[in-house]
Each structure stands twice: as C-alpha cells, then as structure tokens.
Amino acid sequence: MKYASGKEDTFSYSNTSITSVVDGVSKTEKYNASGDIISVTDPAGTTTYNYRPDGQMISVVAPGQITTTFGYDDFGRQTTMNDPSLGIIRYAYDTMGNVAQETDANGNVTKKTYDNFHRLIKKEVAGQTINYGYNADNLIESEVSSNGTSKAYTYDALMRLNTLKETNVDGKWLKKTFTHTNGCISDLTYASNIGNIVTENYTYSYGNLSEVKLNNSTSIWKLTSENALGLTTGVNTGILTRTYSYDANGAPTGRVVKNGSTVIQNSGYNFNAKTGNLNWRKDNVRNIQENFGYDNLNRLTSFAGKTATYSNNGNITNISNVGTFTYNAEKPYAIALITPYGTEVPLREQQIIYNVLRRPETITENGYVATFTYNGEGNRVKMNLKKNNQVQLNRYYWGNQYEFETGVAGSKEILYLGGDAYSAAAVYVKEGSGAWVVYYLCRDYLGSITHTVNSSGGLKQELSYDAWGRLR
C-alpha cells in the first residue's frame, strides 16, 4: 500500500501467517486453523496466545516469559485473570449472566446489581454505593452516590439532553441547560450553586461549528479558513488571530498566534512521512529547536541531546538525564528502584495510596498531603491539600470543564469555554468577588497549554514541556 507521502506499508501471506511492515515496523502474525491468532513477532520479541479446545484464551505469554492466564466456569464465562502486574482478579455472575462481583488481588470487592432489562441499577465500590435510575425511554435519569455526588438528567421530546446537573460533595453543583436548533446545540447555559455563570452560543455552517459566542456578544472562537483536506487553517479568538499550517499529508507544520503584528506563539513541526514520528519541533520566537530519534519500534530514543533505552518488554531502562530504572521481578512492569544521575528526581519520599479503582486516594510528599474524592464513575471530583495538617486548598472538579477552589489564597472559579481543559481555546475565570474575565489559551499540536493571554492580548503565562510532557 503506497501513500502520496512516499510511505509504503507492505503485507505478505504464507499459509496461516501474515507479515506486515507498517510505519516501518515489521510484524509477523500466525493463526491456527480456527482463525485465532497464536503468535505475534516484532523486533521486541514474540507474544504467544494459547487456547482451550473450545476456543477460549487461557494464556498470553509476552517477551521475557511474562504470562497472563485466564480461568473459566462450566459455562465458559471468565472467572479469573492472573495478571503479573495486578495479581489475581476474580469474577462472579448473577443468574442472568451479568458480572455481579469482581474481587481484586487485595480482596477489594466491587458488586453490581441489574434489573430485568440487564441495566445496571446499583454498584458498590470503593466504600460507595451508587444507584442508577432510568426513564420510560430507557435513558439514564439519575446517578446517586452515597458520598454525596450525583448526576441528574432531563431530556426533551426528541430524547435529546435538556439539562444535566452534577452535584459534588459539600453541596457544590454545576448545571448545564441545552437548547437545540435544527438538530444542533445552539445554546449552552451554565449555572452553579454560587449563581448563573454564562451562556455559550453556537453557530454552524453546513452542520459544522463555525463560531462560539458568550451571551450572544463576545466571540471567543470563530473559524475563518480551512484547507482542501478540511483541516482548520485560520481561527479568530477574541483579539487573537491563529494560523495553522500542514504538510501535504495533513501533518501539522506550524502554529502561529498573533495580537495584531505581535507574535505570541510561533511553533514549527516536522514529521517523518513514513512513520508519522515527530522529527523536530521548534520555538521560532526563541529560535530553539529540539530533535527526536526513534528505534525500530518507533519508541523515543533521543530528545534534545538526551537518550532513552528500553528492554524488550517495553520498560524504560535508562534516561540519560534522569537515571537507570530497575523493575520488580514479580511485577515486571512495576518500577522498583530509580538510580538517579543528578537532581532531576528529587531525593525525597513520595507515598501514594490507591483506592479500589486503582486511583490515587492520598499523595504525601514534603509535608503536603493531597486527598482525592471520586464520584460513582471513578472521576475525580475533589482535592483537599494540607500542609502540616493545615488546609491549604480545596478544589472541586466537574468533568474537566469547571473548577471551583477555595483556600488560603482566596476563592476562584474556572470554566473552560468551547471545550474542556484539554481542548478549549478560552477560559472564564472569576477570582473572589471580582468579575468574570476571559483568558485565551494557546496550545501545542498535542493540546497542551503553552500560553495564557488576556482579552487585551497581553501575555499572562507561558509554559513549556519536555519530550515526556513534563512541565519545565
């Protein structure tokens, strides 16, 4: 298969095996007479798959003889999974065949109850009991957790979402009200326990979003141009103009943000057309370029003059500016020891305790203790931060879109506009009893925030990340 970029993927067949070269990586897959895959071989080694006579998989053996096994009952339902990282996970079923109980290697139990229509109506997990309700149209109507979090949904006559109210712990809540026009969301109104926040207004062109306004006045995002591939090439966000460029294959080559003639962001990118890997990125404002290299599995091996090496199972064994990594023999993907080369890794203890959902419950470091609360879906809804047992900050979260915090520095509300924390072009901020203020966000091609700009075009913050996404 040849592409206009010059990239070429190849496939060859021999009896029950397929050998492919995709993105420059060679791989051979072998199948049994039933069409089940029995092995995959690539430059990292061979992974084998073993089956019972009835076709159920009983084990997977990864490079390094890392083995995961599966057990079943007389009905062919999976009852155990023995994972070298997680330990033994056990499953039990109700009389209708639904998974009713899951027990992890630490003995933590998750229970689920279903109605006669196989809909989940109750879940007990991580010390919480969550009850689910449905309306006559079989749409989710409520999720209520014993820890005080909940979600309430209403719908219009066409079964489109009309309102969504998310209640957090401590009586905090956020409500979204949707208005639909011609099958698209035309308005989205936000309100919280503190008061009304704002309404976003959406305009469409041929069914595609073309503009977002606040309260039918301030334009916070407006599409101005696209290329022949349908990729966005021009956007206005308030006073800022944004220009995006691409190579012939659609890979990004540049992102420029200006306030008039003043350049705020000017980033350049170059990708390998055959593998899709990023060759280099450049901050054209500061004339700083970072080059990247990869191995035959497309893993990052060199970055900004530094190097990384890997074992056959994919574990990082060395980063030249950090140190060497040693892994647990019984849990082969778990780091047991880092031997640092310098000061990149702080020489102090950090303790993390996880809940049943394998999410951090507390993080303790350098006199600080962060405690996290989750809703019935396992999403973070609150962080409490203390230092020397004194509260420094309480921060509440709603779906990566709205945050409220209060602490020694005062209170703050944050609402991401036209998207969430990972995609929004603007953010609405209110500090203390002050007025709501719009800030515009510039991002790199991965979506990480690089610049924060006020509504007058003044730069308020600039951020930079290393090759691993760490703030620097």
Predicted regions and their residues:
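Ser/Thr- and Asn-enriched, surface-exposed coil loops between beta-strands
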Residues: S12-I18, C184
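Short, solvent-exposed loop/edge segments of extracellular or virion-exposed proteins
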Residues: I338-G342
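Proline-centered turn/helix-capping motifs that create local helix->coil transitions or kinks
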Residues: Y244, I316-N328, T406-G410, R472
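Residue-level markers of secondary-structure register and packing in elongated scaffolds
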Residues: K2, K30, S34, I38-T41, ...
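Short polybasic amphipathic segments
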Residues: I18-S20, I38, T79, I121, ...
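Extended, non-globular alpha-helical segments
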Residues: E413-G418, Y422
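GD-rich hexapeptide-repeat beta-solenoids
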Residues: D9-Y13, G133, V322-P332
